[in-house]
């Protein structure tokens, strides 16, 4: 699976807690509570001109509210992601200009009950390529 294929636009993927599986396999789990899991949500850039669909992506891992901006294409453009907590929250940006198959990461530190909004675009030579921008998408902060 290529780096680009591993990105799923607007999808969520469960990330199971490995400790529970290990304890069960080792026969040491006496009682079981709810399994802790995180969700990973993705938004991706749109195609425009020579830029491919999903050339850039922004990901939210709900356990710890980690946000990543990833470059999925060797097209020469960087990726800029925008995020905010709540629909009226302050807009923050996270730029990744390190090239294909790289990500930049930040901890959003949002309350579990809030919603995090994500938007991602390509940026070429300091200029945002607005035709590649995703729409704002909203995801729950807590797992």
Describe the residue ranges of each PLM region.
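Post-signal peptide N-terminal regions of Sec-secreted extracellular proteins
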Residues: 36-143
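N-terminal prepro-regions of secreted/extracellular proteins
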Residues: 1-53
């Amino acid at each position: 699976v290529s780096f680009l294929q591993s990105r799923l636009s607007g999808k969520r993927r469960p990330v199971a807690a490995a400790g529970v599986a290990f304890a069960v396999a080792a026969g040491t789990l006496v009682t079981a509570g709810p399994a802790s899991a995180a969700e990973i949500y993705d938004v991706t850039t749109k195609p425009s001109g020579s830029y491919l669909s999903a050339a850039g992506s922004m990901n939210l891992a709900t356990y710890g509210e980690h946000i990543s901006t990833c470059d999925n294409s060797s097209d020469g453009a960087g990726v800029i992601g925008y995020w905010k907590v709540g629909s009226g929250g302050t807009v923050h940006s996270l730029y990744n200009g390190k090239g294909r198959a790289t990500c930049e990461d930040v901890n959003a530190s949002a309350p579990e009950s809030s919603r995090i909004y994500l938007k991602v675009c390509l940026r070429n030579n300091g200029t945002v390529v607005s035709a590649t921008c995703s729409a704002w998408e909203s995801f729950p902060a807590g797992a």
